[in-house]
């Protein structure tokens, strides 16, 4: 759910309510984000905090997304200046919100962080509630900046795996995620596929591959994944999930720093770690 400020329409609220409590974020017109979350999993006490709560410690996640070609910024700029609409550059100026069906899977290791106790159905519901928190946060950015909304596909419980010893993944995520989603969810039943895990890394498996089937090739729509040992909060949702899904929607790396990996020549124009999706 989401809301807009009565006195300040530039202020926005987005929240979810589930069996794990209320989780909300408030975005004011100064750019600050405030959060409301339970103090702990079993607590009725809530805390209000901002992004500074997470500290400034750098989390070691590597983006392994690779580019098959470089980005020609002069060519893109020329097409935009000339108002040219082609198959590879589309100008969306119709103010429409576009919805994409997201098939989001997870490994047993990820599920173990959030499943808690109870029956299998209850444990999957707990994991899905955490996934909802994540995508709710991603949508806050994507709807505002890109006009994109992600909605979960039906039967997503079928790709929430609770046991690491029996889930489909064994260290390789791109191809296995795409194959699992195609088989379990159905290749025609989702537009973008992703996996949450606890690895120290992420990869979209492609750039600009949303809605593409491509017979399990490197441009398949379901090859994305993101993982952190502590896969929760904005350091995971925004810094990494938004980043990897951004590749799937066609974004290249923008950060320009000495130790950057997987350089996309022509697009690294922002200092340090960058600020764009």
Predicted regions and their residues:
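Fold-level signature of zinc-dependent metallopeptidase catalytic domains
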Residues: 42-218
